[in-house]
Amino acid sequence: MHICIPVTEELQDTLGCRFVLYSVYLEGFLLCKVRYKDLHLWNEQIYRVFGNRLPKFPPKYYLAMTKAMTNERRLQLEQYLQQIVSDPVVTSSEIFMEYFKKLQMDTFNMPTVQLILRIYMPDGAAVELDVQTSDSAERVLEAALFKLGVSRELGEYFSLFITHKEAKGPFTVVKRIAGFELPFLTIWNLEDDQFQIEVRKWYMNPSNDAMLMGSTEAIDLLYLQAVQEFQMEWTRPTKDQQQKLQHCLKQQNKLKFLELMKTVEYYGYLHITSCTSDYPECDSEVTIWVGNNEMSCHFYSPGGHAENLRLSIKDLICWNVTLLPKKQEVMSPNHQHLELKFDYQQGSSLKCITIHTEQAFLLSSCLKKMLSERPVHRCKEELEIQVDKATCKSNIRPEQNGVHAKKQALLKDKREYCVVDNISDLDL
């Protein structure tokens, strides 16, 4: 998971005192807005539970802050929150879940109400869940799997995702919803009804399919996703494999279909298209598959040159995701300019490639997931994964989409964001 605070907002309280509101983004999506003093108070509370397990909290300033000091604090808070959300022990605790639930609900002025939330499957079918607006993704996933008949013990192999399907366009996996996020707010804050919440498997090693073969209901989910990958041409079967797979589809032989898919190139990989790269030359198109401990990149340069690059996860030295919003542009998941830059070892030399894709955060999450699935190489999980971003003056506001409810009645006026200068810490 990647935390960033790309924008800040200067406001006044009821007494006329100025303070700074920090907009916290999780993998490119607005998670919450929070004041320094509120985070400081919460840090004191959570410190009583976890002690020195927590990162150091940014110190107070008792003199007026300059613009440079304000930016330094923004970066420090960002680093603090990044370390917090990277600790599964902390993020699964009640004190963490309750606080971030409150932050999200307060940020979007959302009351706790009952509603019917649709959770989709890869074939487009949906289950309807009776949930609350304040239910976490962890809770919603449990409810969805229960309704689908999948045992709770197998829940770790699945997750909720935001996906996007255009009427006559491609299907895209946009992001994984973290366990402490509120799925209704995540989908509610998007701009159109082509976004949806989908339950999908969450592991990068296809051999983990074997862990689900004892559950008929889990096999059904695997089958639906495998069929989707096959029909979307995310995999690359040979002609013989394609004929056999088509026959299995006609016969609705799920186990045989899954068995054959295991032999197909790129089965179980995340497929990313519509990317550009600076390799082998600027503005080269690139198609990416990531999974099974590797990242495969197919480059097509403007001059007609094609090149394939397959990198083992152990060959990657480091990577970082950069969020580059354009000036005077609304900052939203539909208007992101992301790049993923990675360094890799080729022989005795170190090389660097930059890829521009709106799925950069998801790609980064998949790379990290592959590391976590390699217990022999657990030390590589300490690999530095940075998220850089450009601070900008822009508006960030949810747009009405009408996916699950009428939003306008629940929305309040949004204020413009701005970089602050000369604000005393006593006001924060």
Swiss-Prot record:
PROSITE patterns registered for this protein in UniProt: PX
The PX domain, residue ranges: 1-107
Keyword field: Protein transport, Transport
Alphabetized InterPro entries for the sequence: PH-like_dom_sf, PX_dom, PX_dom_sf, SNX17-31_FERM_F1, SNX17-31_FERM_F2, SNX17/31_FERM
Sample GO molecular function, one term: phosphatidylinositol binding
CDD domains: PX_SNX17_31
Any Gene Ontology biological process: protein transport
Family indicated by similarity: Belongs to the sorting nexin family.
Described function: May be involved in protein trafficking.
Classification via PANTHER family: SORTING NEXIN 17 AND 27, SORTING NEXIN-31
Record-given protein name: Sorting nexin-31
Protein's gene: snx31
